[in-house]
Amino acid sequence: MSETSSKHFGSIRDDYAFFLQHSTEAEADLRAYAPHLHGLAMEDESYRMLDFGCGDGGFTAKFLVQSQWLPERLWLVIVEPDATYRRQAVDRLQAFTPHPVQAWPALPPHLKACFELILANHVLYYAHDLKGTLSGILHALATPGLFLAAMAGRTNALAQFSRQCFDILGKPFPFMTAEDVEMALASLGEDYGAEKVHYELIFPDAEEHRLSMGRFLMGSDFDAVPRRAILAGFEPYSNAGEIAMQVVHKHFIVRRHMPWQGRHSAASPPRPRQH
């Protein structure tokens, strides 16, 4: 993720908050990530974590609560291009470690084997150079190490809504999808796993709520889409005074293995640094 990601959240923070409030996406992601974390960090080791595209740190905080890692063992770095979100994330996440949380607007180039865990939760949609971004992330992944990412695919109900709106505008769909991640990982020669994650989006059916969700999905292109098209896009999901959508996306898992002797000890945990 760079400072010029293809979607800017400054004008849609309230709409994004509305989505988070009315969806079970975060809970579903946390449940699905949990089994992959077993054995990642042992009690006498340090663990260096990068959250790539952390937003305001809300999901990261839930992730760290679930992990139950010892604070003194955690070294945390976040990448977030939005300055407001970045400040909020540092304030929220500092409570999870006595070590200063490092915050970057973009991933520095040429990082190598800096992190035992890298999380990219629903952020790779906005990467201008997806293959280059993934290459940089995976170069930063240590051995042993774990990379976890969440991405919606082309059949995702929200992605289909957005695609229909861009079709109306005569514009190509500007965001990456799970299918693009699969192709990028394959072209990089990465051995990865993938699994489906299901969640619900349910909110009271009111015009203002349909418009809010449309604004979240379309970002700066929202005003160009006819209002009636935004409203009509949610009509198939309207029932008994609610909009109810069953949504599915994918998790991608890259795991690096090596013998115990290759792990860093907790006595002198190396801080991520730029090379």
Task: Mark where each language-model region is.
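Class I SAM-dependent methyltransferase Rossmann-like catalytic core
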Residues: 1-41
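Short helix-loop-beta connector
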Residues: 42-48
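Class I SAM-dependent methyltransferase SAM/SAH-binding core
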Residues: 50-108
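A short SAM/SAH-binding and catalytic strip from SAM-dependent methyltransferases
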Residues: 116-130
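A short glycine-rich, Lys/Arg-flanked "PGG" loop and its adjoining helix->strand segment in the class I
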Residues: 131-146
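Conserved class I S-adenosyl-L-methionine
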Residues: 146-173
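Short alpha-helix
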Residues: 173-189
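Conserved Class I S-adenosyl-L-methionine
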Residues: 191-275
